[in-house]
């Protein structure tokens, strides 16, 4: 086994946001959560180094994860990546295991499989990337698959600038290596910071073996700006789409479809172009038509859309919800709502037809109220159901009716004023001959 240390103390200035960088989301999840999940998949001893807005980050983490060991970086005294793992006396923070893996919190695309080459190394090791264009990165000079030295770009000569090997920002160390060299680190550099790369340099100077482990570039993309966040999200989306299609989900124009990590699929499902699946959703034997939005809802044996919106806590089973229908906290069982309706805070029974323009009036300006509709109900177009209200089974509601009282089963309900036709009324109103 090994211990994992995740570095998350930075300010994330380039994100230009009051939200801590590591809490910015990738496909609906804070990017820190991805790296924590990966860490717990390989270790029972996970450490998180915090400083900037640490209480906010800690609160978010504790809502989801148990067993994280929190540390506060002493940035006033020991800043930088090397300082992040230092205690007050410059010794490394205590870990359960002798092998220590160090990761950055702003790399949400890292997976267990991507880390495998680094985990297999028995020596102290640094993860490397091979970049076609390494401009802006420090170069790693190799000799017989071992790290010879690390050169910052500004200090590299012309030959070294041609090197494509760069530091991925992940490390595997033995604890005795950290205990030996971490106290020797200094901050005599332009930034006045302690660097993990300098730790490696100290080891190389004393003939320590440092393995160079090449990793997949795509999995170790660092997120330091909104542009990089968007790029990481697109890569994550490609993974989620592929996983869904591998399960048999049909996607029309998949690049136009957005889905989040909490979405699960069962049975035969079709997603048309422009569909958005947000939060924890279950899509089972369902056809989600073009440009529909499903949030925190369950769609089972049903068709939804096009241009429909299932807001949180909608459970739509054996039903058809058509274009421009919005549901919220609604339970539909065997229901047809073809067009232009709002169905909020309601339960609707089997074989019920909801006409165009029907609205459940669920909010009285102070609180929400529920509408209960039985089975075999026909609701005429442009009707308003003013909650709280209970409509029995086998009920017919005439078009344009406003319902304010409960309707017993077997009833016909009408509330329209009688129609009046005034002879020559058009000409009188417009004063035309």
Swiss-Prot record:
GO cellular component labels: cytoplasm; membrane
Assembly and oligomerization: Homotrimer.
Keywords: Acyltransferase, Cell shape, Cell wall biogenesis/degradation, Cytoplasm, Magnesium, Metal-binding, Multifunctional enzyme, Nucleotidyltransferase, Peptidoglycan synthesis, Repeat, Transferase
Catalytic residue positions: 339 (proton acceptor)
Domain of life: Bacteria
Cofactor binding, note field: Binds 1 Mg(2+) ion per subunit.
Keyword flag Cytoplasm: yes
Protein family (similarity comment): In the N-terminal section; belongs to the N-acetylglucosamine-1-phosphate uridyltransferase family. In the C-terminal section; belongs to the transferase hexapeptide repeat family.
Residues that hold Mg(2+) according to the record: 106, 224
Entries under Gene3D superfamilies matching the protein: Hexapeptide repeat proteins, Spore Coat Polysaccharide Biosynthesis Protein SpsA, Chain A
Gene name as annotated: glmU
GO molecular function, one term: glucosamine-1-phosphate N-acetyltransferase activity
Annotated protein name in UniProt: Bifunctional protein GlmU
Reactions mediated catalytically: alpha-D-glucosamine 1-phosphate + acetyl-CoA = N-acetyl-alpha-D-glucosamine 1-phosphate + CoA + H(+); N-acetyl-alpha-D-glucosamine 1-phosphate + UTP + H(+) = UDP-N-acetyl-alpha-D-glucosamine + diphosphate
